[in-house]
């Protein structure tokens, strides 16, 4: 589009062109009032992206304020590229999770790949070296050819980017439910390490300092990507492929090294990734956070397409680009540094005192807007909220235990449900050992990486059972945080903090907004109780296809500190003769369970209950026992219940099984999904010390029979399962469905 064809301010108003960009009538009137005149085409574009839900959180801010965001270890909470938590010895961990759902629904390979690239930039823009990646994925049922295609391409995109850039993808989760058929969820998380003195902020301080553009050149890809992410998917979304960016991991690898070297220089004042809304968000936010203004000369923007307009340059979401502010007079050092890595570094503006964002192109001023108006003054909406119609009905249901004829066959079938089955097909495509710091690889409760030069480790996980949250958003929200912490504890880590990715449907629907409010209430309560503040995250709304929303899916990414690598614990049995313990009571809780879904083909009723005081007490006891060296293996009891958890601990070992006795109604003790439960094994000589430290019931022992045998309280055999047969079924389920 050439400048001649852009509508003038009067046309923008009269023909409601602003509405096509995503602004409402009221918002356009606000823009007019802020500027004291009608905005031109470029200015309308700036407001439309910065005031989109994706950039401004205008529909979710009132809810997000409920999260606890401070703690004695928190060095940086929400508001910067990523959050930062102190881990002692002048070191800190930097982490964040973000969604790339809409792009991945349209162009799954590039959508997923650029999601990984974007989250990596958020972490190294803080000054940290990225050391690990995780992801949380949701798809429809694998029987559908379209879902198979999305699944295969998303995984390939994550692998393609992560492997090329040389950062290990160490963990995550994949779940399958029909509601994600048309709108998959792709949440990517990056974890980095930093020394305290290297922490950088995305702020443009110092009038007269120089604004520079570094990294890849700008094209027309991703224009209005932030607006695209703030609307529902529909049949016409396929036509929006141009809105999906294309990533170059090799360019990003060079960009990481160049930026980390730059951060060691005292020439750098501020640095920010050009993410959603590209140059617009990075310039407006850096100026606004510093209480300054910025002038930019768009003729100097490196462009890989001809005839780009100011509108296109400002709204492009081309990848692998950063905006930096450097001390005046030090520009040549920066150019030389980036040249060494084969990258462009171009002076394109300066910091001003008057808080305005001014853009010049071809010797003309093409936009003049207060930086705060873009970055901070988006309208905040308190959307109407209404309890979902299904909720009261589910709460009143009398829950019956699903009928199970053959316990062994049921266990075998559960192990083949894609949500429970081995994800080896997924993580075998990821290089999870690159950088040689990975101590616990994918497949256990949490991944663990070594903090080099110390005896410490970082445990990390992503968790969210969206079925529970659909049935009861508040309780489900508590469970998501509690399960993440349980996974960290089972790996020998002390839970530190969380990042979240709130994936929901259209917030303008009162029942969806109710889901958002309630799940955040539950998560906030759990974060306070477990002392894991929220240090950052992302909101992804409008996850709907043809009016049908996905399950509410507020994914939790949690990092924990392993104080000594001797404490690292995994889920698989270690040796025959070890004693098997179960911590926690089992109730007949089947709402949202894998068994319920498998037998009835749908979920209904009440989600499992959770008592956060009990959860905290058990986690503290288990962690103390692990740190005292009393625990051989630890596994949290999740999808599929105790029978699945015990079998998973046997599958991970070689040639080991277990004989256990479980009291209570058979279907419940085997397959119910009650919360706050662990399966722990302990050496026989540690029996007394362990039982003194932890409230647990010894249920049996690890055997070298390669069989899992479970008895009831009358000592009748409920099931005997050959571990090799179970492993084969569990490992083969996903590859079999993809054939």
Curated annotation (Swiss-Prot):
* Record-listed substrate binding positions: 99-102, 121, 245, 317-319, 540
Which UniProt keywords are listed?
ATP-binding, Cytoplasm, Ligase, Magnesium, Metal-binding, Nucleotide-binding, Purine biosynthesis
Coiled-coil residues: none
Q: What residues does ATP bind to?
A: 57, 96, 500, 537
* Localization (cell): Cytoplasm
One GO term in the molecular function aspect is: magnesium ion binding
GO BP annotations, alphabetical order: 'de novo' IMP biosynthetic process
Q: What is its EC number?
A: 6.3.5.3
Q: Where are the transmembrane segments?
A: none
Return the GO cellular component terms, semicolon-separated.
Answer: cytoplasm
For the ligand (Mg(2+) 1), the binding residues are 98, 538
Q: Which reaction does it catalyse?
A: N(2)-formyl-N(1)-(5-phospho-beta-D-ribosyl)glycinamide + L-glutamine + ATP + H2O = 2-formamido-N(1)-(5-O-phospho-beta-D-ribosyl)acetamidine + L-glutamate + ADP + phosphate + H(+)
What task does this protein carry out?
Answer: Part of the phosphoribosylformylglycinamidine synthase complex involved in the purines biosynthetic pathway. Catalyzes the ATP-dependent conversion of formylglycinamide ribonucleotide (FGAR) and glutamine to yield formylglycinamidine ribonucleotide (FGAM) and glutamate. The FGAM synthase complex is composed of three subunits. PurQ produces an ammonia molecule by converting glutamine to glutamate. PurL transfers the ammonia molecule to FGAR to form FGAM in an ATP-dependent manner.
Family the entry assigns: Belongs to the FGAMS family.
Q: Which PANTHER family match?
A: PHOSPHORIBOSYLFORMYLGLYCINAMIDINE SYNTHASE SUBUNIT PURL
What is the protein name for this chain?
Answer: Phosphoribosylformylglycinamidine synthase subunit PurL
